[in-house]
């Protein structure tokens, strides 16, 4: 079954794997999902990710290693989609902070996928993909 919103699927797979206390989750590969995984590793929300392409599998996938705190709680307290295919949400250069700077907005900009802080520093706006805390 085709996925109409690959970013929402990415977010849901990570959220569900964290709720189930899984160490890893596999996500079908797209370049955007790989860039999002890279950003989440840089910001400390996931442990690591690996792109896996085998000859037996027709399609590559991303294996995401989730991160947990010392007491076993998922490092991501909240992750939710802001913009969707039916309702795009754009933010100009004056991007507000999420939860006073504790959380992040992830934006798709002309300079690539950036956090709200990076977009403010580079003075660019874009589509708000999701928020994470």
Swiss-Prot record:
Record's function text: One of the primary rRNA binding proteins, it binds directly to 16S rRNA central domain where it helps coordinate assembly of the platform of the 30S subunit.
Domain of life of the native organism: Bacteria
Single GO MF annotation: rRNA binding
The protein's assembly and partners: Part of the 30S ribosomal subunit. Contacts proteins S5 and S12.
A GO CC annotation given for this chain: ribonucleoprotein complex
Pfam families for the chain: Ribosomal_S8
Cell cycle keyword on record: no
The organism of origin for this protein: Chlorobaculum parvum (strain DSM 263 / NCIMB 8327)
InterPro entries associated with the record: Ribosomal_uS8, Ribosomal_uS8_CS, Ribosomal_uS8_sf
Name of the protein in its database record: Small ribosomal subunit protein uS8
Assigned keywords, A-Z: Ribonucleoprotein, Ribosomal protein, RNA-binding, rRNA-binding
Gene behind this protein: rpsH
Homology family: Belongs to the universal ribosomal protein uS8 family.
GO terms classed as biological process: translation
